[in-house]
Amino acid sequence: MKLGCVLMAWALYLSLGVLWVAQMLLAASFETLQCEGPVCTEESSCHTEDDLTDAREAGFQVKAYTFSEPFHLIVSYDWLILQGPAKPVFEGDLLVLRCQAWQDWPLTQVTFYRDGSALGPPGPNREFSITVVQKADSGHYHCSGIFQSPGPGIPETASVVAITVQELFPAPILRAVPSAEPQAGSPMTLSCQTKLPLQRSAARLLFSFYKDGRIVQSRGLSSEFQIPTASEDHSGSYWCEAATEDNQVWKQSPQLEIRVQGASSSAAPPTLNPAPQKSAAPGTAPEEAPGPLPPPPTPSSEDPGFSSPLGMPDPHLYHQMGLLLKHMQDVRVLLGHLLMELRELSGHRKPGTTKATAE
């Protein structure tokens, strides 16, 4: 009889214990998992074959059924936990961390940490957020707080959670097609190349182009800058910029030097240094000033010296010859003035020479 009573008592005690544990587990946390996204049937699939460029993404579609990406669900029995985002975090995202207490008991003196350093003074706020997260915000986060219930002044610290901020898109690369050294008169295209991850393939980037510190094409959806006819003026240092529509993330490409080949540039006229002329001896008659040079011969199609490879005279050559003849004529005029001055100087010195001889 006593043994039966003892067994019944133990059974009742265990039943009450199981009910209490079950009640605590149910009261601790109640999470709802919801599947969001388009509904796929055998007649219509959620993604085309072109969209499934990655083998990992292609593995989620089997026989016209599309599956969501997996995520890890962690059930914790700690008094205090730090809840982070379930999806990957990219540059420019909003990062929200929540310091969650057991059964949502009230907390005070809540402090958030990254890599062991406090991110602010203690306070009542259980959430910590970064509006525009950057790669530098990656690290190991945790929180601490003091429970106000069930007992006053019970400090607790949550386990560390690793947060990794992924790159939204790499820095763009500026490429020139067909070449960074195009021929003058030929077309050229500058392409600003970068790529978004599959998880953010629906996002849009805006592109702008710069030359020598000046903008040549404002922000737009086109990742190309067209130059229909390249000329010497298009030579210079170019770079491009890719940015999100909200301008939260933007990156520049390295500079690309463009050198247009075959552009004609007018050469500077040659500087003539005339050979020094001997002065006329006193008493000798100076030479008369030379007259103007005869005009250059008229080019003729029969003269091979004036014929270009296409049988037409070269205007650039005529221009250079005209400049040369003009400089030679100026030199002859200067020499004529010099001889006239020497003649006048010798005429002034003759009376003095005669007087000295008479004495």
Swiss-Prot record:
Please give the residue ranges the record annotates as the region Disordered: 259-313
Q: Give expression by tissue.
A: Expressed specifically in primary and secondary lymphoid tissues like lymph node, spleen and tonsil. Specifically expressed in B-cells with a high level in normal germinal center B-cells, centroblasts and in a subset of diffuse large B-cell lymphomas. Highly expressed in bone marrow B-cells and weakly in earlier B lineage cells. Expressed in pre-germinal and germinal center B-cells in secondary lymphoid tissues. Also expressed in melanoma and melanocytes.
InterPro entries given for it? Ig-like_dom, Ig-like_dom_sf, Ig-like_fold, Ig_Fc_receptor, Ig_sub
GO biological process terms, alphabetically, are:
cell differentiation; cell surface receptor signaling pathway; immune response
A GO MF term? transmembrane signaling receptor activity
UniProt cross-references to PROSITE patterns, sorted A to Z: IG_LIKE (PS50835)
Q: What domain of life does the UniProt record list for this protein's source?
A: Eukaryota
Q: Which SMART domains does the record associate with it?
A: IG
Bias-annotated ranges (Pro residues): 289-299
Q: Which UniProt keywords apply?
A: Cytoplasm, Differentiation, Disulfide bond, Immunoglobulin domain, Repeat, Signal
- In UniProt terms, what function does this protein have? May be implicated in B-cell differentiation and lymphomagenesis.
Q: What is known about its subunit structure?
A: Monomer or homodimer; disulfide-linked.
Its recorded name reads Fc receptor-like A
Species assigned in the record: Homo sapiens (Human)
